[in-house]
Design a protein with these regions (language model features):
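Trp- and S/T/G-rich repeat-edge/linker motifs of beta-rich repeat architectures
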Residues: 1-8, 58-61, 67-70, 118-122, ...
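An edge-strand/N-cap motif at the start of beta-rich repeat modules
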Residues: 1-27, 31-39, 48, 63, ...
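Short glycine/serine- and acidic-residue-enriched loop/turn motifs that recur at repeat junctions
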Residues: 1-3, 35-58, 95-118, 155-178
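Beta-rich catalytic cores
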Residues: 10, 19-20, 72, 79-80, ...
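Acidic/polar residues in short coil/turn loops that connect beta-strands
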Residues: 19, 29, 45, 89, ...
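Conserved core positions of repeat-based scaffolds
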Residues: 21-25, 34, 82-85, 94, ...
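Acidic glycine-/aspartate-rich tracts in secreted/extracellular proteins
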Residues: 29-31, 37-40, 68, 88-91, ...
């Protein structure tokens, strides 16, 4: 079975919440483990139990984040209370708090805090017709993906224009806001 050891050679990426509540690590095999505060399911364990504040919660006892059958992560990024993974085939999956649509599901339902919400049950973010991601990044309450065509799409809270869409309207928190309906960041030519 896959493990994340304490060896610095196995863990290839770490991402920490900007306010220090939780973190995630990705192994060289593409497996993800998250620890810390879990009030919104941001650890991806299917519950809201904090992990690492008691004995026997880390190491082999710390669960992997289920990303889906035969899926591995090539990158991870965490926001204040949500996390996203770029998967091996170019899809993006996000979980945790979703109060501003930062998970990109077209609603504000948090994911990862209950059973049957992760793994194959967790839908990928709709990036648009025939689009895949090559990089991901998260902010406090928003998420972005660099797409295979060189465009950038962002979703979530947009109170300061952080989505780069020419207005201050939040995206990803209602139907018909993702996929081809989500405008790419206009960076000029």
């Amino acid at each position: 079975s896959e493990t994340l050891s304490s060896s610095p050679y196995d863990v290839v990426e770490v991402s920490l919440s900007e306010i220090g509540k939780f973190g995630c690590a990705r192994s060289s095999q593409g497996h993800v483990k998250c620890w810390g505060y879990n009030g919104y399911g941001q650890l991806g364990h299917g519950n809201t139990s904090t992990a690492s504040d008691d004995e026997n919660e880390m190491g082999e006892d710390l669960a992997f984040v289920p990303l889906g059958s035969n899926r591995t992560a090539t990158s991870i990024s965490v926001g204040e209370n949500h996390a996203c993974a770029l998967l091996d085939e170019g899809s993006v999956k996000c979980w945790g708090r979703n109060n501003y649509g930062q998970l990109g599901m077209g609603n504000t339902t948090q994911i990862g805090d209950g059973p049957d919400e992760m793994g194959d049950f967790l839908a990928a973010v709709d990036l648009g017709t025939n689009r895949s991601a090559t990089e991901i990044a998260t902010g406090q309450h928003h998420s972005c993906a660099l797409l295979d065509d060189g465009s950038v799409k962002c979703w979530g809270l947009n109170n300061y224009g952080q989505l780069g869409i020419g207005n201050a309207s939040t995206r990803g928190n209602a139907a018909n806001q993702m996929g081809d309906d989500l405008v790419a960041v206009d960076l000029g030519t």
